[in-house]
């Protein structure tokens, strides 16, 4: 049963005025009476629309600098009144039914994100009347349509035209869900903001704020259901943040191929975040969340050729990320050479897409160009809890490194050291990366002892016939013993970059000096678990 309800009277009060004039014009043209408040009412009147100010409708003026506008029985009675049940009381108090409420809320998130935002500014951008109307209309969705997203305007008009000016219960219910999601997210932002403020729970502390709120409220929107999770017996879905400010797998557009799997998304994220570290044309190949080949080159084709050489065996069925547009020549090289699950790049040429289309199972994603990294939070679920930390956006430049050995690195060793240090940040701990001439030549990932990661990196290089002599090695954390340096020297490494900080640093440095290895300390660790 559709349970249509005609829309005869609508109340419009929005902070984000995108599309509101056109929507109001469409409603008015269909005979809908318009009520409005403040700036929205002035805008509609300026556009020549017949609009009644809420203060005129209620007979009660806006007051307290706009803090009190819609908190009135004639407004909320009109929204909450149940058709066929509350008609008599509404008539007794001259309350007219309001069939549609169009509201979006004060821009609290944008306000508190501004540099120098004061507590007073934040407080004045806490909407009171808006959420109250939204919740009232959503509660009474049986009779009232609540609209909180401008993206719904066109669909609402189309449905009204198809139903003689009415909306169905199914649509009103769907709009109500969006409304409750909207107010929940809004209240969560406010709670998170106040929860991280002094003196909310820091007692007499003079610190400006705590980094993390007392109660962490998170809101994510389901982007897609998945066939299954990490394994076929696990159900899964992909949720994304509403306003992501950085190019990411969450915001990427899939332009080709079958649906992404759970593991595809996780691996694509790892590949994309790694390739973002490089300014030069770069390619990152990932398998099971670990880079198995990374290189920079004169072009993305050159970078791909060099990245692939690191470990062609592991590259099979991998994820490939670029930081430049995917061109036809590179696409052809990939398709001719290997099986690939996903290719992600800022963009893809039409010619490249024609080539990859020949392989229906190849998923191609475009994510747009990216600017600087955006600070945010990383989460790790544990049974019964959630670990929260800042994103690891740390990186060192040449000027921040400390040479701790007798020998200084050559210019090429230094370039390779900085290159493999960027890669090591994205390799599972314990992470060891060998690099030479701006390409990885061996990667040791995820071993329980650092020396075995160093040995594996050397074995990988030897298996592919890659020359290790003269290469640089990066370690994501300090060496607890000299054995990792001995293993690297045996393979041919001549420069090591690592955080330092071990109680045996002197022994490790002495080992490097014995082997004639230049060693650089970053004073920054990049564990990845």
From Swiss-Prot:
GO terms for molecular function: IMP cyclohydrolase activity; phosphoribosylaminoimidazolecarboxamide formyltransferase activity. One of its GO terms (cellular component) is cytosol. The modification N6-acetyllysine is found at residue 287. GO terms for biological process: 'de novo' IMP biosynthetic process. InterPro entries: AICAR_Tfase_dup_dom_sf (IPR024051), Cytidine_deaminase-like (IPR016193), MGS-like_dom (IPR011607), MGS-like_dom_sf (IPR036914), PurH-like (IPR002695). Belongs to the PurH family. The IMP cyclohydrolase activity resides in the N-terminal region. This is Bifunctional purine biosynthesis protein PurH. It comes from Escherichia fergusonii (strain ATCC 35469 / DSM 13698 / CCUG 18766 / IAM 14443 / JCM 21226 / LMG 7866 / NBRC 102419 / NCTC 12128 / CDC 0568-73).
């Amino acid at each position: 049963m559709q349970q249509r309800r005609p829309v005869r009277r609508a109340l419009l009060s929005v902070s984000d005025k995108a599309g509101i004039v056109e929507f109001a014009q469409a409603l008015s043209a269909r005979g809908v009476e318009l009520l409005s408040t403040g700036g929205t009412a002035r805008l509609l009147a300026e556009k020549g629309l017949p609009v009644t100010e809420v203060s005129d409708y209620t007979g009660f003026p806006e007051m307290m600098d706009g803090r009190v506008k819609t908190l009135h029985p004639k407004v909320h009675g009109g929204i909450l009144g149940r058709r066929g049940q509350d008609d008599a009381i509404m008539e007794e108090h001259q309350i007219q039914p309001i069939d549609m409420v169009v509201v979006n809320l004060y821009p609290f998130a944008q306000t508190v994100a501004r540099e120098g935002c004061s507590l007073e500014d934040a407080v004045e951008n806490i909407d009171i009347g808006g959420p109250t109307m939204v919740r009232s209309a959503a509660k009474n969705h049986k009779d009232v349509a609540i609209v909180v997203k401008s993206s719904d305007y066109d669909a609402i008009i189309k449905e009204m035209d198809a139903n003689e000016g009415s909306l169905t219960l199914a649509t009103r219910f769907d709009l109500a869900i969006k409304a409750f999601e909207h107010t929940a997210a809004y209240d969560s932002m406010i709670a998170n903001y106040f929860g991280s403020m002094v003196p909310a729970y820091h007692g007499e502390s003079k610190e400006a704020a705590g980094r993390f709120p007392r109660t962490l409220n998170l809101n994510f929107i389901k982007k897609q259901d998945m066939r299954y999770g990490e394994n076929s017996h696990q159900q899964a879905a992909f949720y994304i943040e509403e306003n992501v400010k950085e190019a990411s797998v969450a915001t990427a557009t899939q332009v080709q191929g079958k649906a992404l799997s759970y593991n595809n998304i996780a691996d694509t994220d790892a590949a994309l975040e790694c390739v973002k570290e490089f300014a030069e044309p770069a390619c990152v190949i990932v398998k099971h969340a670990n880079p198995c080949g990374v290189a920079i080159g004169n072009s993305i084709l050159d970078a791909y050729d060099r990245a692939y050489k690191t470990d062609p065996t592991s590259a099979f069925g991998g994820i490939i990320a670029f930081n430049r547009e995917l061109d036809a020549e590179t696409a052809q090289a990939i398709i001719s050479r290997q099986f690939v699950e996903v290719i992600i790049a800022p963009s893809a040429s039409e010619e490249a897409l024609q080539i990859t289309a020949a392989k229906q199972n190849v998923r191609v994603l475009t994510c747009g160009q990216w600017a600087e990294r955006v600070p945010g939070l990383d989460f790790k679920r544990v049974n019964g809890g959630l670990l929260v930390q800042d994103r690891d956006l740390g990186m060192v430049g040449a000027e921040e490194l400390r040479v701790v050995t007798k020998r200084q690195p050559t210019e090429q060793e230094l370039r390779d050291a900085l290159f493999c240090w960027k890669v090591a940040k994205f390799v599972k701990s314990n992470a060891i990366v060998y690099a030479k001439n701006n390409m990885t030549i061996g990667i040791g990932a995820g071993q329980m002892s650092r020396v075995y990661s160093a040995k594996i990196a050397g074995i990988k290089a030897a298996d592919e016939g890659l020359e290790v002599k003269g290469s640089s090695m990066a370690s994501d954390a300090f060496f607890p013993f000299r054995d990792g340096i001995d293993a690297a020297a045996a393979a041919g490494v001549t420069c090591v970059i690592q955080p330092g900080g071990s109680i045996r640093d002197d022994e490790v440095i002495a080992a490097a000096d014995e082997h004639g290895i230049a060693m650089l300390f970053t004073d920054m660790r990049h564990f990845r678990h």
